[in-house]
Protein backbone atom coordinates (compact mmCIF):
# COMPACT_ATOMS: atom_id res chain seq x y z
CA UNK A 1 0.00 0.00 0.00
CA UNK A 2 1.27 3.45 -0.86
CA UNK A 3 0.58 6.19 1.67
CA UNK A 4 1.04 9.87 1.01
CA UNK A 5 2.86 11.60 3.82
CA UNK A 6 0.47 14.27 5.07
CA UNK A 7 1.75 14.83 8.58
CA UNK A 8 1.36 18.60 8.29
CA UNK A 9 -2.38 18.08 8.82
CA UNK A 10 -2.09 16.87 12.42
CA UNK A 11 -0.95 18.83 15.45
CA UNK A 12 -1.25 16.03 18.01
CA UNK A 13 1.82 13.98 18.96
CA UNK A 14 -0.07 10.87 20.15
CA UNK A 15 -2.18 10.91 17.00
CA UNK A 16 0.90 11.26 14.80
CA UNK A 17 2.32 8.20 16.56
CA UNK A 18 -0.79 6.16 15.73
CA UNK A 19 -0.79 7.29 12.08
CA UNK A 20 2.94 6.59 11.69
CA UNK A 21 2.46 3.10 13.14
CA UNK A 22 -0.37 2.32 10.70
CA UNK A 23 1.63 3.67 7.78
CA UNK A 24 4.73 1.65 8.65
CA UNK A 25 2.76 -1.51 9.50
CA UNK A 26 3.89 -1.56 13.14
CA UNK A 27 0.62 -1.13 15.02
CA UNK A 28 0.99 -2.17 18.67
CA UNK A 29 -1.38 -2.61 21.60
CA UNK A 30 -0.84 0.98 22.77
CA UNK A 31 -2.00 2.29 19.39
CA UNK A 32 -5.21 0.22 19.59
CA UNK A 33 -5.75 1.54 23.11
CA UNK A 34 -5.25 5.13 21.95
CA UNK A 35 -7.96 4.66 19.31
CA UNK A 36 -10.23 2.65 21.62
CA UNK A 37 -10.42 5.73 23.86
CA UNK A 38 -12.09 7.53 20.96
CA UNK A 39 -14.94 4.99 20.77
CA UNK A 40 -18.13 7.00 21.21
CA UNK A 41 -21.69 5.85 21.85
CA UNK A 42 -24.43 7.34 19.61
CA UNK A 43 -25.62 9.75 22.32
CA UNK A 44 -22.16 11.31 22.54
CA UNK A 45 -21.63 11.95 18.82
CA UNK A 46 -21.43 15.60 17.71
CA UNK A 47 -24.44 16.58 15.61
CA UNK A 48 -22.48 18.60 13.05
CA UNK A 49 -19.47 16.37 12.31
CA UNK A 50 -19.46 14.56 8.95
CA UNK A 51 -19.76 10.77 8.97
CA UNK A 52 -17.26 8.71 6.97
CA UNK A 53 -18.39 5.35 5.58
CA UNK A 54 -16.81 2.62 3.48
CA UNK A 55 -19.82 2.25 1.15
CA UNK A 56 -21.68 4.69 -1.13
CA UNK A 57 -25.11 3.29 -0.22
CA UNK A 58 -24.72 4.38 3.43
CA UNK A 59 -23.64 7.87 2.37
CA UNK A 60 -26.50 8.41 -0.08
CA UNK A 61 -29.07 7.20 2.45
CA UNK A 62 -27.87 9.49 5.25
CA UNK A 63 -27.52 12.60 3.06
CA UNK A 64 -30.97 12.10 1.48
CA UNK A 65 -32.63 11.49 4.86
CA UNK A 66 -31.05 14.58 6.42
CA UNK A 67 -32.04 16.82 3.50
CA UNK A 68 -35.61 15.50 3.55
CA UNK A 69 -35.95 16.48 7.23
CA UNK A 70 -35.40 20.17 6.40
CA UNK A 71 -38.43 22.27 5.53
CA UNK A 72 -38.77 24.04 2.19
CA UNK A 73 -38.19 23.04 -1.40
CA UNK A 74 -34.76 21.89 -2.52
CA UNK A 75 -32.92 23.99 -5.08
CA UNK A 76 -31.10 21.99 -7.74
CA UNK A 77 -27.83 22.99 -9.38
CA UNK A 78 -26.81 20.93 -12.42
CA UNK A 79 -23.23 20.42 -13.49
CA UNK A 80 -22.27 21.60 -16.99
CA UNK A 81 -19.49 20.10 -19.08
CA UNK A 82 -17.37 20.59 -22.20
CA UNK A 83 -15.27 18.07 -24.08
CA UNK A 84 -15.30 14.41 -25.08
CA UNK A 85 -17.78 12.27 -23.11
CA UNK A 86 -15.19 9.77 -21.87
CA UNK A 87 -12.95 12.57 -20.56
CA UNK A 88 -15.89 14.37 -18.95
CA UNK A 89 -16.95 11.13 -17.23
CA UNK A 90 -13.46 10.76 -15.76
CA UNK A 91 -13.61 14.30 -14.37
CA UNK A 92 -17.05 13.66 -12.91
CA UNK A 93 -15.86 10.48 -11.15
CA UNK A 94 -13.07 12.41 -9.48
CA UNK A 95 -15.19 15.44 -8.59
CA UNK A 96 -16.47 15.63 -5.02
CA UNK A 97 -19.45 17.76 -6.02
CA UNK A 98 -22.38 15.76 -7.44
CA UNK A 99 -23.74 16.04 -10.97
CA UNK A 100 -26.97 17.42 -9.49
CA UNK A 101 -26.46 19.30 -6.23
CA UNK A 102 -29.64 19.54 -4.14
CA UNK A 103 -29.66 22.11 -1.34
CA UNK A 104 -32.10 23.58 1.16
CA UNK A 105 -31.68 26.46 3.56
CA UNK A 106 -30.12 25.02 6.73
CA UNK A 107 -28.41 22.13 4.95
CA UNK A 108 -24.96 21.13 6.20
CA UNK A 109 -22.43 21.43 3.38
CA UNK A 110 -18.75 21.05 2.71
CA UNK A 111 -16.63 22.87 0.15
CA UNK A 112 -15.04 20.52 -2.38
CA UNK A 113 -12.35 22.77 -3.78
CA UNK A 114 -9.96 25.45 -2.60
CA UNK A 115 -11.10 29.02 -3.18
CA UNK A 116 -9.72 30.91 -6.18
CA UNK A 117 -7.22 33.74 -5.61
CA UNK A 118 -8.66 36.49 -3.38
CA UNK A 119 -9.03 38.79 -6.38
CA UNK A 120 -11.45 36.44 -8.12
CA UNK A 121 -15.11 37.38 -7.77
CA UNK A 122 -17.09 37.62 -4.56
CA UNK A 123 -16.21 34.27 -3.02
CA UNK A 124 -14.52 34.34 0.37
CA UNK A 125 -11.63 32.11 1.33
CA UNK A 126 -12.30 28.42 1.77
CA UNK A 127 -10.48 25.11 1.34
CA UNK A 128 -11.47 21.62 0.30
CA UNK A 129 -13.17 20.39 3.49
CA UNK A 130 -14.43 23.73 4.92
CA UNK A 131 -17.78 23.09 6.64
CA UNK A 132 -20.81 25.36 6.83
CA UNK A 133 -24.56 25.61 6.41
CA UNK A 134 -26.71 27.11 3.67
CA UNK A 135 -27.70 30.46 5.21
CA UNK A 136 -29.75 31.71 2.26
CA UNK A 137 -29.63 32.62 -1.41
CA UNK A 138 -28.06 35.52 -3.28
CA UNK A 139 -30.15 37.66 -5.66
CA UNK A 140 -29.05 35.42 -8.55
CA UNK A 141 -30.05 32.25 -6.64
CA UNK A 142 -26.53 31.17 -5.69
CA UNK A 143 -26.18 29.63 -2.20
CA UNK A 144 -24.79 31.77 0.62
CA UNK A 145 -22.80 29.62 3.05
CA UNK A 146 -22.08 30.50 6.66
CA UNK A 147 -18.90 28.68 7.66
CA UNK A 148 -18.12 27.32 11.11
CA UNK A 149 -16.03 30.38 11.91
CA UNK A 150 -18.85 32.75 10.97
CA UNK A 151 -17.67 33.77 7.49
CA UNK A 152 -20.46 34.28 4.94
CA UNK A 153 -19.51 33.12 1.45
CA UNK A 154 -21.59 33.60 -1.68
CA UNK A 155 -20.69 30.62 -3.82
CA UNK A 156 -20.28 30.54 -7.58
CA UNK A 157 -19.64 27.66 -9.99
CA UNK A 158 -16.00 26.64 -10.39
CA UNK A 159 -14.27 24.53 -13.03
CA UNK A 160 -12.45 21.21 -12.84
CA UNK A 161 -10.26 20.78 -15.92
CA UNK A 162 -8.34 18.03 -17.66
CA UNK A 163 -5.28 19.40 -19.41
CA UNK A 164 -2.95 17.66 -21.82
CA UNK A 165 0.16 19.36 -23.15
CA UNK A 166 -1.06 22.75 -21.96
CA UNK A 167 -4.48 22.43 -23.62
CA UNK A 168 -7.81 21.98 -21.81
CA UNK A 169 -9.28 18.73 -23.19
CA UNK A 170 -12.37 18.63 -20.99
CA UNK A 171 -13.94 20.60 -18.17
CA UNK A 172 -16.88 20.43 -15.79
CA UNK A 173 -18.45 23.31 -13.89
CA UNK A 174 -20.39 23.05 -10.63
CA UNK A 175 -20.83 24.89 -7.34
CA UNK A 176 -17.96 23.57 -5.17
CA UNK A 177 -20.22 22.09 -2.50
CA UNK A 178 -21.62 18.75 -1.40
CA UNK A 179 -23.92 17.73 1.44
CA UNK A 180 -21.79 17.13 4.52
CA UNK A 181 -23.82 14.73 6.61
CA UNK A 182 -21.86 11.77 5.24
CA UNK A 183 -19.25 10.83 2.63
CA UNK A 184 -17.18 7.83 1.65
CA UNK A 185 -13.66 7.44 2.99
CA UNK A 186 -12.48 7.39 -0.62
CA UNK A 187 -14.12 10.75 -1.42
CA UNK A 188 -12.67 12.32 1.72
CA UNK A 189 -9.11 12.01 0.43
CA UNK A 190 -7.36 15.36 0.34
CA UNK A 191 -9.74 16.92 2.84
CA UNK A 192 -8.79 18.32 6.22
CA UNK A 193 -11.41 18.20 8.99
CA UNK A 194 -11.67 19.37 12.59
CA UNK A 195 -13.86 16.39 13.46
CA UNK A 196 -15.35 13.29 11.84
CA UNK A 197 -17.48 10.34 12.89
CA UNK A 198 -16.28 7.07 11.42
CA UNK A 199 -17.33 3.44 11.49
CA UNK A 200 -14.23 1.45 10.60
CA UNK A 201 -15.79 -1.92 11.50
CA UNK A 202 -16.61 -2.46 7.80
CA UNK A 203 -13.30 -1.27 6.34
CA UNK A 204 -12.68 -3.55 3.36
CA UNK A 205 -9.57 -2.12 1.69
CA UNK A 206 -6.04 -1.91 2.99
CA UNK A 207 -5.26 1.68 3.91
CA UNK A 208 -8.89 2.70 4.35
CA UNK A 209 -8.56 3.26 8.09
CA UNK A 210 -5.44 5.35 7.60
CA UNK A 211 -7.14 7.55 5.01
CA UNK A 212 -10.16 8.11 7.28
CA UNK A 213 -8.16 8.84 10.43
CA UNK A 214 -5.67 11.12 8.72
CA UNK A 215 -8.44 13.43 7.47
CA UNK A 216 -8.80 14.74 11.02
CA UNK A 217 -6.41 17.29 12.50
CA UNK A 218 -6.23 15.87 16.02
CA UNK A 219 -7.22 12.75 17.92
CA UNK A 220 -9.85 14.63 19.96
CA UNK A 221 -11.73 15.20 16.68
CA UNK A 222 -11.99 11.45 15.91
CA UNK A 223 -15.28 9.81 16.93
CA UNK A 224 -15.17 6.05 16.35
CA UNK A 225 -18.35 3.99 16.31
CA UNK A 226 -16.60 0.80 15.23
CA UNK A 227 -13.13 -0.52 14.41
CA UNK A 228 -11.78 -3.74 12.92
CA UNK A 229 -8.21 -4.94 12.58
CA UNK A 230 -8.31 -4.61 8.77
CA UNK A 231 -8.79 -0.85 9.19
CA UNK A 232 -5.34 -0.52 10.74
CA UNK A 233 -3.51 -2.48 8.04
Regions found by a protein language model. Give the residues of each.
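C-terminal accessory regions
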Residues: 107-233
Amino acid sequence: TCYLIEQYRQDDTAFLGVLSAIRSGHVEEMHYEELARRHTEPAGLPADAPKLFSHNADVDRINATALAKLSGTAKKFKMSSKGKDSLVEGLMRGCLSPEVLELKEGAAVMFTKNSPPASAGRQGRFVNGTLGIVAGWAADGMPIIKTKNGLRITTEPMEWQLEEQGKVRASISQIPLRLAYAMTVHKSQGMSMDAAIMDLSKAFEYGQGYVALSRVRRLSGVYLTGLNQRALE
